[in-house]
Amino acid sequence: MTPRLFALIPCAGTGSRSGSAVPKQYRTLAGRALLHYTLAAFDACSEFAQTLVVLAPDDSHFDARRFAGLRFAVRRCGGGSRQASVLKGLLELAEFGATDHDWVLVHDAARPGITPELIRTLVATLKDDPVGGIVALPVADTLKRVPAGGDAIARTESRDALWQAQTPQMFRIGMLREAILQAQREGHDLTDEASAIEWAGHTPRVVQGSLRNFKVTYPEDFALAEAILARPANAS
């Protein structure tokens, strides 16, 4: 049986670094909620069986009317960290008929520049892979190491062979669930899914990402994201 595709959007964070009273995934950019762009990209990929959005149990900002016409489901089961929210979302996917052998693509709600084309490139590249992988970009900037709490450069780090992880991150549902459970048992709270897969001894692949697919994190990122989203993805 051909493995099915599911998308999982952890959306339980508060976005404290964004400088906004409203969680960043609900901020309006180019006329729509930031989260809308992620949901629309996956909605355009009809090959997905379901897109599941994981909210915090006490989220009072989510308004389904802002996402009318898009195909997705919501579960208010988010945890205290990304890792916890993803794990709970993976368990909820079983309700939609997902099996351990099916694929899940986990994507940050705060990466509104994702496109259907990039999603499909990731799937096409990894659909026959035994592990899975992520979209990422080679590090372009010179890297400096600065001690915690300081402002003096300790040394310059080589950027050779370094990649900056993005999302979506695509893995088998069963493999990812067990990898996260193992990390939890060993006291680790990892910041992305590939880290859990690596921790379990597997080797994820990287697929070329896009500068457009950056993560909105700081206050100044909103203006850049709005400028990008106001233009078609294929605009020069």
From Swiss-Prot:
Q: What does this protein do?
A: Catalyzes the formation of 4-diphosphocytidyl-2-C-methyl-D-erythritol from CTP and 2-C-methyl-D-erythritol 4-phosphate (MEP).
Q: What is this protein called?
A: 2-C-methyl-D-erythritol 4-phosphate cytidylyltransferase
Q: In which pathway does it act?
A: Isoprenoid biosynthesis; isopentenyl diphosphate biosynthesis via DXP pathway; isopentenyl diphosphate from 1-deoxy-D-xylulose 5-phosphate: step 2/6
Sorted alphabetically, which Pfam families does this protein's record hold? IspD
* Annotated PROSITE patterns: ISPD
What's one GO BP annotation on this UniProt entry? isopentenyl diphosphate biosynthetic process, methylerythritol 4-phosphate pathway
Q: What lineage does the source organism belong to?
A: Bacteria, Pseudomonadati, Pseudomonadota, Betaproteobacteria, Burkholderiales
Q: Where is this site: Transition state stabilizer?
A: 17, 24
One of the entry's Gene Ontology molecular-function terms is: 2-C-methyl-D-erythritol 4-phosphate cytidylyltransferase activity
This enzyme's EC code(s): 2.7.7.60
